[in-house]
């Protein structure tokens, strides 16, 4: 029988919760959870605990929330936990070399891409946006670089035509649990075979910003449809209508072969509103006007008789 591992878990957002719950339910011992400090959230800007902290507290696991892991105090605290390994999932703090070297087996990271493609902050969204056929999760041995460590386990999944960043996020989070448990099992039985990343294949997934969510109707319908799916649920693709932002939650490549001016609403039907683009048409299915709830594009377009009007 292999000995259960003493594990420190470090993570912050929703993506990190399934791996933490998987570890709690496993034979291993989660000795502590590290997460970002509570942040103001919602309309009242009330201090709110991260999803990972909430999960840890529900299971009576000690929670640490240092602002930095670079101070001697924070490092002494972590070292005192005498962990075998630290699992890091979207934690959001830089781990200095001293911390990376503290646990017996170092620090392992669950990254939501097939490395070395899409190192960085937004691998899920960039994979959809660029039309990748597949993506996955990589478990890597962390080093001081950004997602540069040796790869220990890779699990893949196809990107489906209907995938949004949310659906892919949920699937990869679950896949990350499987990859993590496989890696820990291999670590316990000394069967890990680290693979170096090919630096020639590296691409970077830049952090998302709200400005890039605005649709450029000169682009192709294919590009715009991917943008809508990649930016759902945040920052949400949008266009302008009568000087107000109109969020677009759901869209797909339309069937109209059009030479019409990009941004022109060609037709409105029960399936949605079809808009001319730089190449082909985009069928918009769900929109959200400023200050209102999301609604079928058909309802929005019918009420305003949008056929023949221009968006953007």
From Swiss-Prot:
Substrates-to-products reaction catalysed: L-methionyl-tRNA(fMet) + (6R)-10-formyltetrahydrofolate = N-formyl-L-methionyl-tRNA(fMet) + (6S)-5,6,7,8-tetrahydrofolate + H(+)
Pfam families found in the cross-reference section: Formyl_trans_C (PF02911), Formyl_trans_N (PF00551)
Highest taxon in the source lineage: Bacteria
Root EC class: transferase
Disulfide bonds listed in the record: none
Residues that coordinate or bind (6S)-5,6,7,8-tetrahydrofolate: 113-116
InterPro entries: Fmt, Formyl_trans_C, Formyl_trans_C_sf, Formyl_transf_N, Formyl_transf_N_sf, Formyl_transferase-like_C_sf, GART_AS, Met-tRNA-FMT_C
Any one GO cellular component localisation term in the record: cytosol
GO MF term list: methionyl-tRNA formyltransferase activity
Signal peptide: none
Alphabetized UniProt keyword annotations: Protein biosynthesis, Transferase
Family: Belongs to the Fmt family.
Purpose: Attaches a formyl group to the free amino group of methionyl-tRNA(fMet). The formyl group appears to play a dual role in the initiator identity of N-formylmethionyl-tRNA by promoting its recognition by IF2 and preventing the misappropriation of this tRNA by the elongation apparatus.
Protein name: Methionyl-tRNA formyltransferase
Organism lineage: Bacteria, Pseudomonadati, Pseudomonadota, Gammaproteobacteria, Thiotrichales
Gene symbol of the encoding locus: fmt
């Amino acid at each position: 029988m292999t000995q259960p591992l003493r594990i420190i878990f470090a993570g912050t957002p929703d993506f990190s919760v399934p791996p933490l719950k998987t570890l709690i339910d496993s034979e291993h011992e989660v000795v502590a959870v590290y997460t970002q400090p509570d942040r103001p959230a919602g309309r009242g800007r009330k201090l709110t605990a991260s999803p990972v902290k909430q999960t840890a507290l529900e299971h009576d696991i000690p929670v640490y929330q240092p602002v930095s892991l670079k101070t001697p105090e924070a490092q002494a605290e972590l070292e005192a936990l005498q962990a075998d390994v630290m699992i890091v999932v979207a934690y959001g703090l830089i781990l200095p070399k001293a911390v990376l070297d503290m646990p017996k087996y170092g620090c392992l990271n669950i990254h939501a891409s097939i490395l070395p493609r899409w190192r960085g902050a937004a691998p899920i969204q960039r994979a959809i946006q660029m039309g990748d056929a597949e993506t996955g999760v990589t478990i890597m041995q962390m080093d001081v670089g950004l997602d540069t460590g040796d790869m220990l386990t890779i699990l893949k999944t196809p990107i489906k035509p209907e995938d949004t960043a949310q659906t892919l996020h949920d699937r990869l989070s679950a896949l990350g649990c499987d990859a993590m448990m496989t890696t820990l099992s291999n670590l316990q039985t000394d069967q890990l075979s680290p693979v170096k990343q090919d630096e020639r294949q590296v691409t970077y997934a830049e952090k998302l910003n709200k400005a890039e969510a605005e649709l450029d109707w000169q682009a192709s319908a294919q590009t715009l449809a991917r943008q809508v799916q990649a930016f759902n649920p945040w920052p949400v693709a949008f266009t302008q209508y009568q000087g107000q932002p109109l969020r677009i939650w759901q869209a797909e490549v339309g069937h109209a072969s059009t030479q019409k001016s990009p941004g022109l609403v060609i037709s409105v039907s029960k399936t949605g509103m079809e808009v001319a683009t730089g190449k082909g048409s985009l069928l918009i299915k769900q929109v959200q006007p400023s200050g209102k709830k999301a609604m079928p594009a058909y309802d929005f377009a019918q009420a305003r008789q949008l056929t023949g009007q221009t968006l953007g």
